[in-house]
Amino acid sequence: MKFDLTTAYTLSIPLLASSGTVLATTADTSSKSSTMTAIHTSTGYNNHSDSLWATFNNNVALTWDAPNNEFYLPVITWHNRYTYDKEKTDKYNERPWGFGYGKYRYDKDNDWHSLYAMAFMDSHNRLEPIIGYGFQKMWIPGDLDGFRLGVGFTLSVTARHDYYYVPIPLPLPLFSVEYDQLSFQGTYIPGTYNNGNVFFAWLRWQW
């Protein structure tokens, strides 16, 4: 059988055209699929962010409208001796005289929410204000009536003399040991050597 190059060339044109169409269609479909996946992912992320923001705003509004009050009495500022030179801790103030006031509520899960403001003497014996929102998951240990343990966080803003009282955002962990209306509540401020690494605590009275 004789093989005709002209015939082979003629037949190859529609085959190549057909293959090109299939490849183009496949590439186009893949591109559209990737685009739709990206759109759905972006939309899901945005919806989740919007949901978190809406929940936060709702919690702040409900706490602001709550009729319950709290009084705060700062009791200790302890500088972690494992992360400070002794010559520094010897000069630092660890009696944070001050006071604070807040509004609070317990939600349907018995979790604590608060909006608060506090002012106290910092490590250099200078006035330091702080305001913020606090949240704690609460746990009642066994049958110990009136006792509660809490772990959570605060989203706060503070200002210090050594930073010219420029507002500084300060998200921090929170914990508390509570009995009825009285609580011992505190936080730990992380840091580096000779900076931060401070345990700060206060008494809290609710009415």
From Swiss-Prot:
Record keywords, A-Z: Acyltransferase, Cell outer membrane, Membrane, Signal, Transferase
One Pfam match: PagP
InterPro entries, per database record: LipidA_acyl_PagP, OMP/PagP_b-brl
Record's keyword annotation contains Heme: no
GO terms (BP aspect): lipid A biosynthetic process
Superkingdom of the organism of origin: Bacteria
Site (Role in the phospholipid gating): Y193
Site positions per UniProt: Role in lipopolysaccharide recognition: K88
Catalysis: reaction(s): a lipid A + a 1,2-diacyl-sn-glycero-3-phosphocholine = a hepta-acyl lipid A + a 2-acyl-sn-glycero-3-phosphocholine; a lipid IVA + a 1,2-diacyl-sn-glycero-3-phosphocholine = a lipid IVB + a 2-acyl-sn-glycero-3-phosphocholine; a lipid IIA + a 1,2-diacyl-sn-glycero-3-phosphocholine = a lipid IIB + a 2-acyl-sn-glycero-3-phosphocholine
Residues of the active site: H79, D122, S123
Signal peptide interval: 1-24
Subcellular location: Cell outer membrane
Cellular component terms (Gene Ontology): cell outer membrane
Record EC number: 2.3.1.251
MF term (GO), any: acyltransferase activity
Main subcellular localisation: membrane
Family: Belongs to the lipid A palmitoyltransferase family.
Main function: Transfers a fatty acid residue from the sn-1 position of a phospholipid to the N-linked hydroxyfatty acid chain on the proximal unit of lipid A or its precursors.
Subunit structure: Homodimer.
Name of the protein in its database record: Lipid A acyltransferase PagP
Species this protein is from: Photorhabdus asymbiotica subsp. asymbiotica (strain ATCC 43949 / 3105-77) (Xenorhabdus luminescens (strain 2))
Gene: pagP
